[in-house]
């Protein structure tokens, strides 16, 4: 974590409330300047904290160091800026103690929006648990546990990648034959980005990470074809059936966010729900625009350093972090 002082007390308090207490908590700080480390020190008498300061460390470097320092066989991973449900650790660890124990347990995460903008971001970008296909789900490292023996066997978070590092780690675990189990009740809560500008930057970085790692190329190709080929043709040719096709496509693209918003309508004021409904199409456009901008930057980064034929499958996991783009 880095500069998480505002949200850190809630995270630490949620750790203290766990129905199954952790044997140890290894925290790596990436060089915070806002008092994060001092706050951690204040909690040493309430939690079994081990604090490691690594100024300038990337997310992947910090996680790898924390796992290397851990002593237990099962490692549960979360992030700064979240709040854990009281039974999060208990539910995340329980499958390892049963029959046919897995190697990885995928927890879940839900949004905790504090404004109509955050609500719109939540329903547009985050799936509900019922939408997840456990066989294909790639867990976020906000909520995941795995056997440390996988790490000791050489599987690492990719230190050459600044964003999407948990996706690459998941894919490499799958490729190594790790057995996954989905536990949707192991929940962490977190706030979406507070502004559309912050959201755009987040999605630019995610798409740049996809380009760097060679992730989801088909999805990005469809997005480029839609915005850079199909929609310009619709405007240029002005055929009614093309406008109809574009409208049907937009309706299908927006259907799922509106369904999520409808399911959550009782949880928020009516005014919030109405404003979020208006914002959903804008969120889609901003997110797609950010991805259209970020993905080529990532491709260029990979082409210059490794060549476009190399992807997360062949780029070594342990490399000094390259300069940012």
Task: Mark where each language-model region is.
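Glycine-rich, basic loop-to-helix element that forms the pyrophosphate-binding segment
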Residues: 54-70
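Catalytic donor/gating beta->alpha subdomain of glycosyltransferases that bind UDP-sugars
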Residues: 158-217
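Conserved donor NDP-sugar-binding/catalytic core segment of glycosyltransferases
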Residues: 87-118
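A recurrent flexible, glycine/aromatic-enriched loop bordering the glycosyltransferase active site
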Residues: 111-113, 127-146, 161-162, 168, ...
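Short aromatic/hydrophobic "clamp" motif used to bind/position activated sugar donors
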Residues: 75
